[in-house]
Amino acid sequence: MDVAFPGMERHDEKNPPGDDGTKPTGGKKARPAIKIKWYWKGLILLVELCIGDYLLDRYVFGGVMLRTTIAYAVLARVGLDYKLHYGKDCWLARHPEEDLHHRNAQRVCTMLKWNGGLYLKAGQAVAMQGSVLPEEYQRMFGEMFDDAPHSSWSDVEKVIKQDFGGRSIEDVFGVAPSDQQGDSQFVFEREPRASASIAQVHYARLPDGRGLAVKVQRREISKQVSWDLWSMKLMTEYTAWVTGLPMGGMGQFVADRVMQETDFEHEASNSEKMADLIATDSSLRDRVYIPKVYREFTSKRVLTTEWVDAVQLWDRDAITGQVAPSRSATSDKPGLGLRLDDVMRTVVELFSAQMFSWGFVHCDPHPGNILVRQNPKRPDSAQVVLLDHGLYITMSDKLRRQYARFWKALVTNDDASLQRVSREWGMKSADAWADASLMRPYKNPSSSDDESGESWQRTKETPEERKQRMIDEAAAYLGDEGLFPRELLFLERNITIVQGNNRFLGSPVNRIKLIGSCALKAIRDDGQGKESIRERISTRVALLSLDLAFWWSAMKQYFGYGEGLEQELKEAEDRQLRETKDAVAELFGITVN
């Protein structure tokens, strides 16, 4: 029943009148506006920002932010795991050390391999001198020299097209890509023969019969490396600011040198320059070989050299194995029938010539970059093939001569000359750099009288005084920033890796004597003063003492009472490292096991 009130009009509920009082003819009822709570708006905005950042990071910055986030997350997880389950003061239940080290080493190694680039290079550096880490880490980090994860074939094609004006692989090399491996076909193999931190190597065989090693850079590596180096530079500057150590400019110096590795045209120039230098040395020109660079197939991100069949430096069985008369169905590769001492002598003399004679030093001599083959002219002797010429330093003549005098003073125990060179480098003490160069403690006889008194004084130190003393000692090691030659960082890296190679092969040569002899030869060739008869006798006695130490160690090794001179030096170094662990824990609050 309808009821009407005065002054009111009845309207149809389903079709209310419009603003002008007219009744609409039809249509649905208007829905009220939906009001979104503020926290939903914030969540939607956050999701949009995350998606936008991810797409920007992946397609513009090469995934650098994701890689950095993963690295920090893994390291934070490892640190938390040790805080929770390691040591007497752990926060939760204590876990067995082997299990704890194993799972965290696995986490770190997986992260390094996945991130690639400089992360993988860092893992290789730790693997070369990993005695500061637990045994589980050393085993895991040993895998860093295995083939790294390789780029997809589509990425390889994109890099070659971009660097060669849009031309395809068939147009550039004149051969078609193939999934088959072998030397009988004229192909460009899709599957890489080797994969490293910033590039991978494909084999190609041209119609004219030339075998090529085509090194193709990872597509996003230039963006990733620049970000990684920027992060490293910030950490270096932060450490310098916190501790007061004179190392603020080192981060930029290292970053500039490592960035050169991403320019393969620069690497090609380094390779050709090293080949020219070796050709001028009559003692090395037949014992060392640098693969020829093909400039017509080389660009900023593609390096093409001749293919050289050889074995890696650490493949002892292949180097020393008997030469097979012919390949059998079961033999993978016949031995070369070479002597390890012949190989390592060439390696040590090559890098010594770079440091003391040429001033142009290869700074990444890890075993993957050193191959060994039979000398084409004398098959019974070894020829070393040097690869990967991206990371070099150029020494000034002044620094080259100083470094030669530094090593002469080391092998002849000439403390006065050692301190004189160190002062020229802005160092307060030469002992630390002597330890690092020799890979063993360098004992300064003049300090022995004060040793007991200094030890007694250190027992009375407060934690703050001990921390300040360690900072002062580190500052003395690094020297005055304006005088300290930053090239020494890479020189010591070279020395350390060569020492590791010699130790792995069982110390076949007296490395310290060989380096010292090359330094003495360079000093004579440069005419840096004439030696008196007394100095000559002193030098010969010092070299003879090194020979006696080497042969005594070799004799013990032969009868099963040792593992060679380098291993004995390594044990002395390990004792120093144990002291360093305590110092690091005191200085930075980091427990290194």
Curated annotation (Swiss-Prot):
Q: Which PANTHER family match?
A: ABC1 FAMILY PROTEIN, ABC1 FAMILY PROTEIN C10F6.14C
Query: At the top level of its lineage, which domain of life is listed?
Result: Eukaryota
Induction text: Expression is positively regulated by the leucinostatins biosynthesis cluster-specific transcription regulator lcsF.
- Which family does the record claim for this protein? Belongs to the protein kinase superfamily. ADCK protein kinase family.
Lineage, broadest ranks: Eukaryota, Fungi, Dikarya, Ascomycota, Pezizomycotina
Biased composition, Basic and acidic residues: where in the chain? 8-22, 457-467
| Species this chain originates from | Purpureocillium lilacinum (Paecilomyces lilacinus)
Q: What is the protein's name according to its record?
A: ABC1 family protein lscO
Identify the InterPro entries for this entry.
ABC1_dom (IPR004147), ADCK1_dom (IPR045307), Kinase-like_dom_sf (IPR011009), Mito_struct-func_regulator (IPR051130)
Q: What does this protein do?
A: ABC1 family protein; part of the gene cluster that mediates the biosynthesis of the lipopeptide antibiotics leucinostatins that show extensive biological activities, including antimalarial, antiviral, antibacterial, antifungal, and antitumor activities, as well as phytotoxic. The function of lcsO within the leucinostatins biosynthesis has not been identified yet.
Q: Where is this region: Disordered?
A: 1-29, 441-467
- Which residues, if any, are the signal sequence? none
